[in-house]
Amino acid sequence: MSMRIVSALIDEVHGLEESVLITGVGKINATKALEREFARSPFRLPDLVINYGTAGKTTESLNVGDLYEVGKFVQRDMMGTELGFKEYETPFDATHVIENGRSNLTCGTGDSFWTPKNKEIFEIVDMEAYALAKVCQDHGVEFRCFKFVSDGGDPDEWKENVGKGSVLFANKLKQIREEETK
């Protein structure tokens, strides 16, 4: 099985002994980088894209310093309610929630650093996962996503923890590769 690992920042994967596509921060950068990668070899797309990165938690049921697999993805900054659409629903797009069936954990992706406001429908927040999941869905490529919870909406906490999850992710990759050979 061919696999491509994708992350927003080199700081998130520092020390990882893998080839990683670094996309840059945000939905547009993530989309652009992965589409460009797919366009380079359109007849040899990877079987699997794995996104790894940091995420903020919106609930006390998750722990800063733990690695989680995400199974659902929404755009947390998509607001078309004035047009009669539901919160987080992209107007005139059939796909509002992308699910891979790997877990019930939902990631809200947006182009701003999330800060605690109110109860959300998602447990973690990031700035790239929904965009990457959408590109993979459009190309028929399996998508998995692992997020290291770095903070609870505190930018200083994120800065302190951004590089601490790569060892956990390296262990998860080893486990995935071992399962693949069975």
Predicted regions and their residues:
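Extreme N-terminal starter segment of soluble prokaryotic enzymes
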Residues: M1-R4
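Structural motif
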Residues: V6-I10
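Glycine-rich phosphate- or other oxyanion-binding loops that anchor nucleotides, phosphorylated ligands
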Residues: D11-T181
